[in-house]
């Protein structure tokens, strides 16, 4: 048990340590997939397969770890982990299927980037699953648990709705297109360039509220460090590609702010 506690604490420390370098590096150099795809990053695989493989630890590792937790027989632990699993079922299974069905582009996803994402999801999947199933210590505080869970769940559900809806719009534009990109319009796309990222940031803020933990907050913090610089780069990409046709008053990711 002591060795697992040590591993858990070092993994949590790692999650916080890598957040700032991630923000700084992605501010200057974008991961080469999607709109920012470019050569020079080694062999590639199909994007749907990449998404499936690199996101999968969040599912199988959670199912592997949960039975060994002291809260395995507590229904609240299953309730709490459900939004996390629901998000990653969409990201690991449904999203790659939508990509495979609707995308005609042949540009690959760098194996090196998928490998790094796989490593992060191992780290984060371990932390979130182990916290909920074993280390969380306030399940017995009924009032606090339910207030935090319901408030966080509301934020999470709204964020996931925004995220999935925006992803569907973007995938739909790929299906309509001739291999190129189009300006997304409607909904939150009128306010920000990347409502899909805004929705995901909302989700993990809601998760931080639900778990009420340094583990949940660390994931939210890292999500911001990963997605906000990419949203900024995506907005600049749109402005450069579409010039005056792209609305200059759209923010990158947070409506009216950033």
Curated annotation (Swiss-Prot):
Gene field: DET2
EC number: 1.3.1.22
Chief subcellular location: membrane
InterPro entries: 3-oxo-5-alpha-steroid_4-DH, 3-oxo-5_a-steroid_4-DH_C, SRD5A/TECR
Enzyme class, UniProt record, top EC level: oxidoreductase
Native source organism of the sequence: Gossypium hirsutum
Name by which UniProt lists this protein: Steroid 5-alpha-reductase DET2
Disulfide-bond pairs as recorded: none
GO MF entry, a single one: 3-oxo-5-alpha-steroid 4-dehydrogenase (NADP+) activity
GO cellular component annotations of the record: membrane
Top-level taxonomy: Eukaryota, Viridiplantae, Streptophyta, Embryophyta, Tracheophyta
Catalytic function, reaction form: a 3-oxo-5alpha-steroid + NADP(+) = a 3-oxo-Delta(4)-steroid + NADPH + H(+)
Residue stretches spanning the membrane: 8-28, 49-69, 77-97, 109-129, 144-164, 201-221
């Amino acid at each position: 048990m002591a060795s697992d506690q040590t591993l858990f604490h070092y993994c949590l420390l790692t999650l916080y340590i890598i957040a700032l370098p991630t923000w700084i590096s992605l501010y200057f150099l974008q991961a080469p997939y999607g709109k920012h795809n470019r050569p020079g990053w080694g062999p590639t695989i199909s994007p749907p397969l990449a998404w499936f493989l690199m996101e999968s630890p969040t599912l199988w590792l959670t199912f592997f770890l949960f039975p060994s937790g002291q809260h395995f027989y507590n229904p609240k632990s299953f309730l709490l982990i459900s939004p996390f699993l629901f998000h990653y079922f969409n990201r690991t299974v449904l999203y790659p299927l939508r990509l495979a069905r609707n995308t005609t582009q042949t540009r690959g996803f760098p194996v090196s980037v998928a490998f790094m994402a796989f490593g992060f999801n191992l780290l984060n999947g371990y932390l979130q699953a182990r916290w909920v199933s074993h280390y969380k210590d306030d399940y017995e505080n009924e009032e606090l648990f339910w207030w935090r869970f319901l408030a966080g769940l509301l934020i999470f559900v709204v964020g996931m709705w925004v995220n999935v809806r925006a992803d569907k719009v973007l995938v739909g534009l790929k299906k309509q297109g001739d291999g190129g990109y189009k300006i997304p319009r409607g909904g939150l796309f009128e306010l920000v360039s990347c409502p899909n990222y805004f929705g995901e940031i909302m989700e993990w803020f809601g998760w931080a509220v639900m778990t009420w933990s340094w583990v949940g907050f660390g994931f939210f913090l890292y999500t911001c460090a990963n997605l906000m610089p990419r949203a900024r780069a995506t907005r600049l990409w749109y402005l450069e590609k579409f010039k005056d046709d792209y609305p200059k008053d759209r923010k990158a990711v947070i409506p009216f702010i950033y």
